[in-house]
Amino acid sequence: MEFSKETRRLALQKMQERDLDLLIIGGGITGAGVALQAAASGLDTGLIEMQDFAEGTSSRSTKLVHGGLRYLKQFDVEVVSDTVSERAVVQQIAPHIPKPDPMLLPVYDEPGSTFSMFRLKVAMDLYDLLAGVSNTPAANKVLTKEEVLKREPDLKQEGLLGGGVYLDFRNNDARLVIENIKRANRDGALIASHVKAEDFLLDDKRQIIGVKARDLLTDQEIIIKAKLVINTTGPWSDEIRQFSHKGQPIHQMRPTKGVHLVVDRQKLPVSQPVYVDTGLNDGRMVFVLPREEKTYFGTTDTDYTGDLQHPQVTQEDVDYLLGIVNNRFPNANLTINDIESSWAGLRPLLSGNSASDYNGGNSGKLSDDSFDHLIDTVKAYINHEDSREAVEKAIKQVETSTSEKELDPSAVSRGSSFERDENGLFTLAGGKITDYRKMAEGALKVIIQVLKEDFGKSFKLINSTTYPVSGGEINPANVDSELEAYAQLGTLSGLSMDDARYLANLYGSNAPKVFALTRQLKAAEGLSLAETLSLHYAMDYEMALKPTDYFLRRTNHLLFMRDSLDALIVPVIEEMAKHFDWSTDEKVKQEEELRRVIAENDLSALKGQQED
């Protein structure tokens, strides 16, 4: 179904002509998940996003749909149980996006190690039980030092005890967002990017009845009326709530910044994802992940108080990550000049709760008795021999027996929060990408109840555990063969097998629509046929309005295909200019914006300082 600049114009027109059941502010993964379930359940739904979809936070993750073995470092068993079950749901509803990618976790004999070999084995067994993969080919494996080095010969050998391999999944975070958005559009949601909420409309009882917004493409003010409004703006959540709390600061959010760096795989060859202690005795771990022909690594996890829209990679971030990777992979000798791309993102964390861990945290010491009791209790619960209450009690005992230290950014709760202010504004904040569907479901249950009680409108919430996103109409048990069949179809449209396979994996069950564009399109000047199809599909069916939308979020050109990017810049801008009828000035503006983003990702300014 078309989802284009014209779709956007019509959506804004319709939003101003009706009283929506629900207006969603924020088009990251949280807002996209809410929009899909609301529209599919029959609510008259609108969504506005001040940037491109996923631009703020949801395209800047570590790009995993992980089960959270790391949460077992804090023995947050309930979080892991929820996360692995939700990961399985995401595999069902978006089978073309998460791909299994077993993770290698080396264990070193050094101060501050997260796991000993024994505790790693227990944690992995517990993880497998929670994930339902015990006694399957996906079950964990304990590796000797020699087996670890056979898999990753460039790892540091000194102090290496062995390691483990456990099931994890890579993700295309921005694609997961746009596929949810497209499905919501197909189901009738009115959706527009580059529209910024500026204030609330209030009735005489100071209850929200809509939003004053601004179309950032035309600078026009827009009035959108809605029975209910939900704030899903991630790091911006406090700012939106501030509209009606002028002079009274709201500090629910405590954003932290995460940085990832990308190098050519030849500079840092890894055959599989690696998750390893930093070696700095700081309680943290880093991922080193192969993607395309590149390797990326991260993340940092530091408190952030700067510009929410433009978090930057600093020299301190670069030095921290390069130091860790060069220590763990002694032959790499990476410098800042080896970095081809990068990204900095903000995690929309909730302040005041250190129960859950993201990247190590600082949870103090745990006695062996507490550890063993928790493991035994959880195993009994999984085998239906003990109650959930017993698990909760054991977890509380762990928490009280842990000497809690100063609140570390890495130990801020990744849990979600769903609140309603006195003016009626709902705010859904926090959480992890993996949990987006469950968060949306919880919010919609309440919203549907309020619509019934306060407005006399009845809706039945869809079963979102089986409701596929756009592109996800593939048998989850047969993903590889179905995508291969789509690729074969692409070759009949004149594409090479490699190009057809690339498009099939990118678009899933939408691939035939992409291939069908060959009936009206030929390869544009300077672009391959596959690139031309992908670009036009992005403009007409994915609301890509700017070159940065296409290069950074609809595709991974800017992150993991840097070698071929420069040759595509001018041809893509020329093709977009024809499509959108841009003036010469607009073309220049779009190219300048793209080159600024590329320079930021390339760390050109930091590299320039090194040369001075």
UniProtKB/Swiss-Prot annotation:
It catalyses: sn-glycerol 3-phosphate + O2 = dihydroxyacetone phosphate + H2O2. Its EC number is 1.1.3.21. One of its GO terms (biological process) is glycerol-3-phosphate catabolic process. Residues 399-408 have a biased composition (Basic and acidic residues). GO terms for cellular component: cytoplasm. The keyword rRNA processing does not apply. Gene3D superfamilies: Alpha-glycerophosphate oxidase, cap domain, D-Amino Acid Oxidase, subunit A, domain 2, FAD/NAD(P)-binding domain. PROSITE patterns: FAD_G3PDH_1. It is found in: Cytoplasm. GO terms for molecular function: glycerol-3-phosphate dehydrogenase (quinone) activity; glycerol-3-phosphate oxidase activity. FAD binds at residues 21-49. Its cofactor is FAD. Residues 399-418 are annotated as: Disordered. It comes from the Bacteria. Keywords: Cytoplasm, FAD, Flavoprotein, Glycerol metabolism, Oxidoreductase. This is Alpha-glycerophosphate oxidase.
